[in-house]
Design a protein with these regions (language model features):
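Acidic, glycine-enriched catalytic cores built around paired aspartates
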Residues: 1-138
Length: 138
């Protein structure tokens, strides 16, 4: 793809899924992302529209984390977003897997509509996953 006016360089992906935000443009948190995605008309998206989110593991700490995540998922569906994929990792974990692939051979990630072992993906795809915004709150 060609470069775009927002500073994205030629050859870089537009986004990592049908309705995922462009890297770095998701600055208002996870809730704002799915509310925006829910406003899209996906009637002509014959193969579906996926929303990818990289969640920081700290979101799942605490007594209420399961309940809060369930409410978050219900809210996503209430907004009309029907296909959401999550990676629950830190950027540091992904960078370490890139540097030491033998130690992370079993690390599976959601790419964009499919899962793959992180260490067998090409560096460009790995970098794209690492560049996703790690959301630390809903």
């Amino acid at each position: 793809t060609a470069a775009t006016p927002n500073g994205r360089h030629a050859g870089e992906p537009l986004n990592d899924g049908g309705i995922s935000p462009t890297h770095g443009d998701d600055t208002k948190g996870a809730t704002a992302i799915f509310k925006s995605a829910g406003k899209l008309c996906n009637v002509r998206a014959g193969h579906g529209s996926v929303l990818n989110q990289l969640l920081h593991p700290s979101i799942f700490k605490g007594e209420e984390s399961d309940k809060v995540f369930g409410e978050y998922m219900r809210s996503i569906c209430d907004c009309g977003v029907w296909e959401t994929q999550f990676n629950v990792l830190t950027k540091e974990d992904l960078l370490q897997a890139q540097k030491h692939p033998d130690e992370y051979r079993s690390l599976v990630v959601r790419v964009a509509g499919y899962s793959a072992f992180f260490t067998v993906l090409g560096k460009g795809v790995q970098d794209d996953i690492i560049d996703r915004t790690s959301l630390m709150q809903y």
